[in-house]
């Protein structure tokens, strides 16, 4: 009998990662396979810029996973992240007739209005409900409360439309069904942060190769999300000014770089080896690394809204490949004046695996493991024999794909969960919203006509002619009654 499993793919700037695993009854995860493909030639700053090469990477990952699992893959979970993702607050106001009791339908209406907001060249990926203002008070759950003025405050997560469209195009061209798209920063946050950190207020910093992602939580709610185009590769590029090749500069960074070196520990006579024939002055090397690290840290801290900078009682949590640099936590403490800094080397879930990429706990697999943890639909297809594999590995990753597993859902049910609607889902939601809007307009038109008829009737009844005729009829009736 074919085994069930979940497949997730992370589209990173340095590498694209595919993972297959199973979720156990005790909440743990068993990893069955992991595959990596170099993506530097098709993804920059977390954004797809070469669709054809991205399709090739995706196809290769699926083929390798199928080969390892000896089983078809019907659909995959996908992480969405990268440059230009940002959050923006939006307030929707609704005045109520008199003192009205707030219903869930009213809340859904606010969510629908917010979801249908348009921004130039931007796509709303998700919206995190911040709170509701009821008259002059703020509430998280306003249903059942009586008021005359209601405001919904939302944090919209925006991304460039063409970036969003490129992801959908790549998976369509590669014939891979998407089970669900998730905001990668939110999926990872749910796997590396504790509930107490989110409630107390914390700053999560994912130090990646091309980008640094900053998420701010307070009272258990996402309050800010931004991606800055700075990462570990910027340090590598700066080091090339000392004449090493890119590959050598990367190796030197991984071997020698520290985020901070006490000046008393710098030996001006010490040189770092590039290869057997070349060396670089350690002092210059240290100066370059520290300058770029400081720039990244300062820019990350600058992303935190002023209203939350003094509310981070849960501290700062660092993750991603850049968090492995020695003394990186010290630099964050120095620049933010926050002493509580934790490096999240691994997810909070129990993960069973023998793969060194996972067991080494470097923080570089946290996002894809977070995506895997989010999965709740089977991605496994039929089993096949090795003899048949060559004929099967190029089949479309569909069949019993996402549509066969996924039940229709209300878009409002996914608000704030990190779920990103696919292009097909978004189109369906827009059509449903249009039908609903047309129905409401028709109902409003009929109601207006009915009210107009009733108003005309009232005016007619109150007119002088009508009053005279009623009086005359009454006079005639009374006269006849007296004669009888």
Predicted feature locations:
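Residue-level signature of catalytic and energy-coupling elements of molecular machines
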Residues: 8-9, 18, 78, 171, ...
């Amino acid at each position: 009998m074919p085994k069930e499993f979940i497949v997730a793919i992370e589209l990173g700037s340095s590498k694209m990662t595919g993972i297959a695993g199973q979720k156990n009854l005790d909440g743990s995860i068993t990893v069955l396979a992991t595959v990596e493909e170099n993506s530097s030639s098709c993804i920059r700053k977390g954004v797809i810029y070469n669709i054809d090469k991205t399709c090739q990477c995706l196809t290769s990952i699926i083929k390798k996973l199928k080969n390892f699992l000896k089983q078809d893959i019907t659909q995959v979970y996908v992480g969405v992240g990268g440059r230009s993702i940002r959050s923006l607050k939006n307030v929707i106001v609704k005045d109520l007739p008199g003192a009205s009791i707030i219903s869930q339908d009213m809340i859904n209406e606010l969510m629908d209005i917010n979801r249908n907001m348009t921004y130039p060249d931007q796509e709303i990926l998700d919206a995190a409900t911040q709170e509701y203002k009821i008259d002059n008070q703020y509430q998280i759950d306003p249903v059942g409360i009586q008021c005359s003025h209601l405001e919904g405050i939302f944090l919209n997560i925006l991304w460039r439309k063409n970036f969003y469209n490129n992801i959908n195009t790549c998976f369509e061209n590669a014939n891979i069904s998407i089970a669900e798209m998730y905001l990668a920063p939110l999926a990872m946050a749910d796997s590396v942060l504790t509930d107490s950190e989110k409630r107390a207020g914390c700053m999560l910093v994912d130090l990646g190769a091309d980008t640094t992602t900053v998420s701010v939580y307070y009272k258990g709610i996402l309050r800010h999300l931004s991606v800055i185009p700075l990462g570990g590769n910027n340090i590598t590029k700066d080091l090339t000014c000392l004449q090493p090749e890119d590959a050598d500069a990367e190796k030197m960074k991984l071997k020698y770089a520290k985020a901070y070196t006490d000046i008393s520990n710098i030996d001006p006579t010490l040189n770092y080896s590039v290869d057997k024939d070349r060396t670089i002055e350690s002092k210059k090397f240290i100066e370059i690394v520290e300058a770029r690290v400081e720039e990244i840290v300062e820019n990350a801290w600058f992303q935190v809204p002023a209203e939350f900078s003094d509310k981070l009682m849960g501290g700062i949590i660092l993750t991603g490949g850049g968090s492995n640099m020695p003394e990186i936590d010290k630099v964050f403490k120095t620049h933010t004046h926050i002493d509580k800094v934790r490096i999240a080397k691994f997810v909070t879930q129990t993960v069973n695996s023998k793969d060194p990429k996972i067991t080494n706990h470097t923080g570089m697999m946290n996002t894809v493991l977070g995506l895997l943890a989010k999965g709740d639909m089977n991605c496994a297809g039929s089993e096949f024999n090795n003899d048949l594999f060559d004929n099967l590995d190029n089949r479309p990753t569909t069949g019993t794909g996402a549509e066969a597993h996924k039940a229709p859902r209300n878009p409002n049910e996914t608000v704030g969960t990190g779920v990103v609607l696919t292009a097909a889902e978004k189109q369906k939601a827009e059509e449903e919203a249009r039908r609903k809007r047309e129905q409401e307009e028709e109902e409003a038109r009929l109601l207006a006509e009915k009210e107009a008829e009733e108003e005309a009737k009232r005016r007619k009844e109150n007119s002088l002619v009508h009053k005279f005729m009623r009086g005359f009829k009454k006079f005639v009736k009374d006269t006849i009654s007296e004669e009888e």
